[in-house]
Structures are given as C-alpha cells and as structure tokens.
Amino acid sequence: AASGVATNTPTANDEEYITPVTIGGTTLNLNFDTGSADLWVFSTELPASQQSGHSVYNPSATGKELSGYTWSISYGDGSSASGNVFTDSVTVGGVTAHGQAVQAAQQISAQFQQDTNNDGLLGLAFSSINTVQPQSQTTFFDTVKSSLAQPLFAVALKHQQPGVYDFGFIDSSKYTGSLTYTGVDNSQGFWSFNVDSYTAGSQSGDGFSGIADTGTTLLLLDDSVVSQYYSQVSGAQQDSNAGGYVFDCSTNLPDFSVSISGYTATVPGSLINYGPSGDGSTCLGGIQSNSGIGFSIFGDIFLKSQYVVFDSDGPQLGFAPQA
C-alpha cells in the first residue's frame, strides 16, 4: 500500500502554497486546492509569452490525448483557464497516478499570467465538480485512493515556512492532542462541514457551514461576523483597494475560534495579520467577507493553525492543533 509526503512552500505573505509535482517526467510547481477538482497545468500549447517564467508540460512528449475532451474552469477570485486533456503519469510525494487526466492550458486569465510562482493547480475537492467535458475525470487523490494505505490525505500549512501534504497516512508528530472528526457534506463537491458556534475576540455567535479550502488565502466569513470581529480592532477600516479591512500593522488582534463537534479550533490573532496592505502604512486582515455566498471559506489563514485530515471514508474531516 502506498503513502507519501509532499512538501508545500508558501509564497510571499503565505498568499499561496506551492508543491512540486512530476508529470510525464517534468516537474511543475502546483497550487494544491481542496476547493476545486481540476488538475491543470501551464503547457506548450500556450502562447510563448505566457509560458515565460514557468515550468510547462509538453503533452506531445509523454501524454496521450483524450480526443474531443475539453475543460474550462473559473474560480472565486474571477480567474479562469481552459484547454484540452491528456492522460499521463503524475507523481506527488512519491505516490504515482497512472493514466491521470492532465488538463493542458490553452488559455489562462491575466491573474495566472502574472503569477510566476505557480505552474497550475492540483484539485483535491470531490471529482463530481471536475470540469472536463464530455465526461468528468477523477482528481489525483481519487485516482490513487484505492492504492493508498488509508484513503485519506492530510495537510499542515505553516506561516512562512514549509509544510506537508501527507497522502495515505496520518502523521501524529504534526499535531498535539487527538484528532476530532466531523462529518462532511460533499453534495456540492466540497469538503463542507458545520461549526456549532464561533468566538470573535470577546463576542460569540451561532454556528454556520463552511468549506476547508487550501486554495483560498484568507478566512472568508459572513459580513455580520466580520464586522463584529473588526469592531474590536482599534482603527480598523474598510479599504476596497486593499481588499477589505485594514489596520495599523502594530495592532494586537483578537483570536478567532470555531467549535467543531466539541473541539475548539483557534486561529491566534497573530495569524490574522495577513501582511502589508500595499498602501505603505496598514496591514490587511486575514478575516474578510465571503461576499454573501451563503457559506464560509476556511482558507489558509484558518488552516495554518490546524493539522487537517481529509478522509474519503465518511467522508469526514479531522482537526487538531498543529504541533
């Protein structure tokens, strides 16, 4: 039975986490995204100017084309990509998926053209939301799941230092105490779970649902919760240019916690200072609005405090404080 460890590395301010993946012999740096289910890569089919600064996949070298298959995906931040589809061998942390669908980009939006840190995405949500037509394809995890020692993966993202994706096993050295599991509703293709209540600084409130999303930088919550949090941060104000609430960089921030099946997951205030806002004097908050989408997004700001097990048996999520 297989298992493996892949190291993720944050970019500046922990904006995204990059992990090396070998596809048909070429190693690309991909953003692992538990909020989507497409494995797409920069390819030699893109205009040469858009390949600049990237490792690119050359499908004609090792790939086998799925004739007539196409894909097109758009993300919550407005970015998008599309192209055609090949199968190839894909290796992550020593675990290899044979005949894995690899979505070769032929068009990418400006956001991806400008981001030279990543060479594509590796989706780890449920395969039901894979965008390949006419027939959706399985994610890397779903392809290898049956060969793993346990049908799960786990993630530890860290602040400005490398972390891990563990495939097929749980590394008890990466967390303290014991894991608390909670059920997942995957009807929309996401790792969605419920929190029973939350505490923002000195104020508390009722629970809500959210998704565990490694591909989102911030912790995105209902407006009422966000305003309640920043009402406790002196001098905090909305700055639409910066992307939400900002505050003086020296401000001490309150903690934010959620109760999950009896376990309290706490994001320390120090992690809620995302980094410089870009205006030269303030910092951007790591908690921001979910734009009224009806659920919360537990992105990297939240995940940095936890070791999280994504278990396809159930399915369920396991949480414990990072060691």
From Swiss-Prot:
Reactions the enzyme catalyzes: Hydrolysis of proteins with broad specificity similar to that of pepsin A, preferring hydrophobic residues at P1 and P1', but also cleaving 20-Gly-|-Glu-21 in the B chain of insulin. Clots milk, and activates trypsinogen
Entry-listed glycosylation sites: 3, 7
Superkingdom of origin: Eukaryota
GO molecular function ontology, one term from the record: aspartic-type endopeptidase activity
Subcellular location(s) of the protein: Secreted
Domain named Peptidase A1: residues: 17-320
Classification via CDD domains: Aspergillopepsin_like (cd06097)
Keyword presence, Hydrolase: yes
Keyword Protease: yes
SUPFAM superfamilies the record matches: Acid proteases (SSF50630)
Catalytic residues (UniProt): 33, 213
One GO BP: proteolysis
Disulfide-linked positions: 249-283
Pfam families assigned: Asp
One GO location term (cellular component): extracellular region
InterPro entries reported for this sequence: Aspartic_peptidase_A1, Aspartic_peptidase_AS, Aspergillopepsin-like_cat_dom, PEPTIDASE_A1, Peptidase_aspartic_dom_sf
Role description: Secreted aspartic endopeptidase that allows assimilation of proteinaceous substrates. The scissile peptide bond is attacked by a nucleophilic water molecule activated by two aspartic residues in the active site. Shows a broad primary substrate specificity. Favors hydrophobic residues at the P1 and P1' positions, but can also activate trypsinogen and hydrolyze the B chain of insulin between positions 'Gly-20' and 'Glu-21'.
UniProt cross-references to PANTHER family, sorted A to Z: ASPERGILLOPEPSIN-1-RELATED (PTHR47966:SF2), BETA-SITE APP-CLEAVING ENZYME, ISOFORM A-RELATED (PTHR47966)
Listed name of the protein: Penicillopepsin-1
